Amino acid sequence: LLVYTFLLGLIWNLLTKTSPAHDSYNILSGSQQFAINDYTPLMPENDYFYDYPFQLGYAFVGEIIIRIFGDNAYFILQLLNILASVGISASLITFAILIFKKRKTVNFTILFLFGCIQPILFTTFHYGNLLGFSLSLWAMVFTCVYLKNRKKRFIIFSAVFISAGIICKSNSLIILTAICIILILDFLKTHKLANITAILISVIMGIGLNQLIIFQYEQRADVSLGGGVPKILWLDMGLQETSDPNRPGWYNPEYTVIRYNSMNKDEKAAADSGIRDIKKRISKLISSPAERANFFATKTLSQWNDPLYMSIWVSSTRGAREEPGSFVKSMYSGNAGILTENYANFYQSFIFLFASAGMLVILKRRNIRRNSFIAVLPLIFIGGFLYHLFFEAMPQYNVTYFTLFIPIAAFGFSECCEKYHDSLIGFIKYKFRKSKTKSEESV
């Protein structure tokens, strides 16, 4: 499976040859200049890193890769995405072992991961989504291993991986929160003080290292970047309608960077403006139940109704180092793309169906619910789901969260096979005998 995932990702990247664009272009252009000790992107006349200083985490990764690999850096970053996709698959298999402890469930997890093409197609995107998620999932794996054997070195492994995940993508704070919740729940049962130590180390390293990277760039460039666009503005944006009624809460710079810059980058004034907006919007949603239901239902559907989670879109809307071939063009806007989307639609429905069955079995069986790790995958998913329900929405953010359903779907499928095995075999035998009888009568 891991070799298959790597090779498929490698082939797709070699075929598409995409280049950075939009945010990834701004970030990696900065990385290129930082690599030659040119800090022009951090000067006051260049807004990007003043608006989004948290992006300096991935810029730091890009700078290191560019310093080492030079002109091949963009492909190496895609290679890291491919390895991240491999890492996600490996972590999900590990979770299947830790949580369900059944060979059939593990085997079905591996089988279903063979069909999960969305993260593989997403590897062309020069951004920290996959890398951050993979590193953070492994941080959770190490947390679970620590809780299982109480060996404290796994606390350090977890803290290092979650810190690296947050550096690559700030959304990894969602998994840091899940790690803290799991450790607190275990502490309430066991009263192990090492859990509190683990939380402190993870939080300090997870948040502190990213801030340290920003600080070192400020020192190198002799500037002060400030906090950037206040996070409250992203909540304001996530609660607003957009010009497209089918995409409420999607990215709209009017509520974030445009407002921030219109107030001369005054963080307090921008935040206060956002809070006033949020209060008005919440008041309106509370007073109109129909509008509230329609807004959040439409926002949820707009994120989850794309079975590919924009994994082809992130390639098709960006430039390429070379003219793409006929197959890639067909994937972008032809029959190959239609077939791929139809397959992804079936696969997504299949996973959701059996993940639902798996959750029903988990809720019914007390012995499974007692497993300390049973809440891990649902907790991460719920954190991501709620975050994007209220903040910025886009299907591409869910390409990683979707994979969390796979081990649960494998468990659900395994349980269904065991429960209905005899009935299914009996039905097949009955149909076979009936068919045989008809053929004999016709003779």
Q: What residue ranges belong to the model's regions?
A:
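Membrane-proximal stem/loop segments at transmembrane-domain junctions that anchor or position
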Residues: 40-41, 218-322
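Loop-to-helix entry region of an early transmembrane alpha helix in multi-pass inner-membrane enzymes
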Residues: 52, 56-60, 68-87, 341-345
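Membrane-interface anchor segments at the N-terminal boundary of transmembrane helices
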Residues: 75-76, 80-81, 298-381
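Transmembrane-helix motifs of polytopic, lipid-linked glycan transferases
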Residues: 79-101, 138, 357
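Transmembrane-helix signature of polytopic, membrane-embedded enzymes
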Residues: 92-115, 370-375
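Short acidic/glycine- and proline-prone juxtamembrane loop motifs at membrane-interface regions
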Residues: 121-132
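Membrane-interface alpha helices of multi-pass inner-membrane proteins
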Residues: 154-169, 179, 202-206, 383
